[in-house]
Amino acid sequence: MNEDFFTSDVTSLFFNSSCGIFPTIAASYPIANYPLSGLTVYFDVSKGGFTFRNSLYNGVGYNGWSKHDNPFLVRPKKDGIFNMSQLEFSYSGGNYFAGAAVHTRHYGVDPDGNQCEPDQSTKKASCAWWVYGEQKVWQAADKEIACMAQYSENTNHDNGCYRYAELGVAYTDSCNQCGLSGQYARFYQGAEYSLELTWRRSLKKWLSVQPSLQYINNRNGDFVVLCTRLTCEF
């Protein structure tokens, strides 16, 4: 999932405090979101500036290698079925996305936001939908500035997260990519606000380092998180 969806340039720059991908999906379903994996049937179709993507997954992701815990399990009756569809449009320096995901089972959460085990899930479908866009607003030689806006909701307010929004801006040149973004997520146990400042520096053509500073506020208090990402391309 992490390689097929939410991988556009500005979106993938940010670490995000809430689950990496949109939390209306990642915090609501135990799906194949890193570090979990699962089998999928995937296809995409492109024509002109449009691309349509679709992935069909087993309803639960796994990260073990035992008989009852491995990425190759397909158990729609117990785990449910999870489907993601997205339509993309590229035009004049911008990329725009709209999509929806449907899960055939409901995974409830306790007051602390902990998700129930798969065998405690119920047969109740829900949907998460999202829209987001990235648009270049300035460009000169190898330098550019792009803005990004995202919004997503889950139809079941008893899921882990039912609303998410983000605004961000990114500067890119031949050796640097810097970004600033603010996020809002409405989890079952309360709201979370976060601010992220990140800088990706290319050391060589194949090597880059990216520190990220995040400020997070939720019902448990205020937190500051420092992360670093090292990327090798070959």
Give the ranges of each region predicted by the language model:
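Membrane-embedded beta-strands of outer-membrane beta-barrel proteins
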Residues: V41, S85-L87, V131-G133, C147, ...
